[in-house]
Curated annotation (Swiss-Prot):
Signal peptide: none annotated. It comes from Thermococcus onnurineus (strain NA1). One of its GO terms (biological process) is isopentenyl diphosphate biosynthetic process, mevalonate pathway. Component of a hydro-lyase that catalyzes the dehydration of mevalonate 5-phosphate (MVA5P) to form trans-anhydromevalonate 5-phosphate (tAHMP). Involved in the archaeal mevalonate (MVA) pathway, which provides fundamental precursors for isoprenoid biosynthesis, such as isopentenyl diphosphate (IPP) and dimethylallyl diphosphate (DMAPP). This is Phosphomevalonate dehydratase small subunit. InterPro entries: PMDh-S-like, PMDh-S-like_dom, PMDh_S. SUPFAM superfamilies: LeuD/IlvD-like.
Length: 130
C-alpha cells in the first residue's frame, strides 16, 4: 500500500511502525532518556518509539515538546521517522531541529503497529509492506 502525503522534513527511513490513534504530547508524554511513552492517556503508553517509525494523528501540548524530540535524537532514542495526519508547529519544529524525516497528510487509521514501512519524505510517500 502506498500513501501520499506532504514532506515536512526530507530524508528516508525504513522500519517497524508504532502507531497511536490519539494525539501525542512529547513534553511529559515521552521520556527523552528512554524513548518510552509515559502519557497516561496514550494508547501506546509503556512502549518505546526508539528506532521505530512513529505515526499519530497530530501533536498536542507545550512548545517545549520540540526540544524533547531533539533530546530523543541526542540520546539515541528518537524514532527513525514521523508520520502524522496533521503537522503542527511543535512536532514539525522538533523534527526539523532533530533531522528526523517527517511526512504529514497521512490517514494514520490505515496503519497498524508492527507493520514495516518505508518513508520517502522528500516525495511525501509512505510505503507499507503487505
Amino acid at each position: 500500500m502506498k500513501l501520499k502525503g506532504r514532506k515536512i522534513v526530507g530524508g528516508k527511513a525504513e522500519g517497524e511502525l508504532i502507531v497511536s490513534q490519539k494525539p501525542l504530547s512529547f513534553l511529559g508524554g515521552v521520556d527523552p532518556n528512554t524513548g518510552i511513552v509515559t502519557d497516561a492517556e496514550s494508547d501506546i503508553r509503556g512502549q518505546s518509539i526508539a528506532g521505530k517509525v512513529l505515526a499519530f494523528p497530530r501533536g498536542k501540548g507545550s512548545t517545549v515538546g520540540s526540544y524533547v524530540i531533539y533530546a530523543l535524537k541526542k540520546n539515541g532514542k528518537a524514532p527513525k521517522a514521523i508520520i502524522v495526519g496533521e503537522a503542527e508547529t511543535i512536532v514539525a519544529t522538533g523534527a526539523i531541529i532533530a533531522g528526523i524525516p517527517m511526512v504529514d497528510g497521512i490517514d494514520v487509521s490505515k496503519l497498524k503497529s508492527g507493520q514495516r514501512v518505508r518513508v520517502k519524505a522528500d516525495e511525501g510517500l509512505v510505503e507499507v509492506e503487505e
